[in-house]
From Swiss-Prot:
Keywords: Cell membrane, Lipoprotein, Membrane, Palmitate, Signal
Pfam families found in the cross-reference section: Lipoprotein_3
Species of the source: Mycoplasma pneumoniae (strain ATCC 29342 / M129 / Subtype 1) (Mycoplasmoides pneumoniae)
Sequence intervals crossing the membrane: none
Lipidation (N-palmitoyl cysteine): C26
A GO CC term assigned to this protein in UniProt: plasma membrane
Membrane topology type: Lipid-anchor
Cellular location(s): Cell membrane
Lipidation (S-diacylglycerol cysteine): C26
Family per similarity comment: Belongs to the MG439/MG440 family.
Name assigned to this protein: Uncharacterized lipoprotein MG439 homolog 3
Signal peptide location: 1-25
Keyword Amino-acid biosynthesis: no
Keyword Plastid: no
């Protein structure tokens, strides 16, 4: 063998070997950190100075390239932990922590999913009167009662989030006016305004949010981890199903052309930013 050629190649080989080892070590670190939510929490508890959104996104992005299933399951676990275990929609708001995760000028009503105008996408069903519809629901409290998820691939996953709520029908003048207009449209099954007077206005409701693979060809990919915008946008179809224990409301949800729209609604072309939930779980 030509010794000069050997001497020439050896430094290059060593450089490539070193570079490859560094990349492997980086990938290994990312995979270990995001292998589970608890692993990520332990890592950032020990490296608090590294807990910024850009770093978290880059770690998850690197982890996704080597173990997509573990990465997505870790993201889903953060989503569940923040909504169900940390109860951000039920407890008094930790303003500092919430702002760090969800951004400035954001509140509980901006959380998706939630029982709110934005969280229920009411503007897409009741254009022009979505605020009044939210007031008709008169949400007094809401609670995440179930959160299940499974992931096999970008074309085979499912997330189901269940909410229980307590509300008061017609909790203001605007909502009362809207109820009157709905009832005047007919097909009410003999339901009248008197059926919602005083204590009869109280009701319990259930909302179930089901996220499934998009039918428009979009897929969750490496590019969805965006450290520049500080987002991890997860594309999915969404179905929202509603039910209530209130007999008269149930009749309206079956018969009234306006009220029954809320019973079951499907949305396509949606993307859901999972980073705020994951980041909140790490804080």
């Amino acid at each position: 063998m030509n010794k000069k050629r050997l001497l020439f190649r050896t430094p290059l080989d060593a450089l490539f070997l070193l570079f490859g080892t560094a990349l492997s070590a980086c990938s290994s670190t990312a995979t270990n950190v995001i292998s589970s939510l608890s692993s990520a929490q332990k890592y950032f508890d020990a490296h608090k100075s590294e807990l910024i959104k850009k770093n978290v996104i880059n770690l998850l992005k690197e982890g996704y390239s080597t173990d997509s299933k573990a990465t997505v399951n870790s993201l889903f676990a953060g989503w569940k932990y923040t909504l169900m275990d940390q109860k951000i929609l039920e407890r008094n708001l930790d303003a500092s922590r919430f702002t760090k995760a969800f951004g400035t000028n954001k509140g509980k009503d901006d959380v998706i999913p939630s029982i709110s105008e934005k969280g229920l996408f009411l503007d897409e069903t009741y254009s022009g009167v979505s605020q009044q519809i939210a007031k008709v629901l008169g949400v007094q409290s809401q609670k995440v009662t179930g959160f299940s998820y499974s992931w096999s691939s970008t074309t085979n996953f499912k997330v189901v989030i269940s909410f229980m709520m307590q509300g008061i029908v017609g909790s203001g003048e605007e909502s009362n006016s809207l109820i009157k207009s709905f009832l005047s449209s007919g097909n009410n099954g003999n339901v009248t305004e008197n059926d919602f007077n005083n204590g009869n206005a109280n009701f319990d409701g259930t909302f179930i949010f089901t996220f499934t693979p998009p039918t428009d060809g979009r897929r969750f990919a490496f590019s969805n981890f965006d450290p520049i915008t500080g987002t991890i946008n997860f594309p999915a179809n969404l179905q929202i199903d509603a039910s209530t224990t209130h007999e008269k409301l149930n009749i309206l949800m079956q018969n009234n052309e306006h009220v029954k729209k809320i019973k079951s609604r499907s949305f396509t072309g949606k993307s859901f930013d999972l980073l705020p939930f994951y980041f909140y779980a790490l804080l």
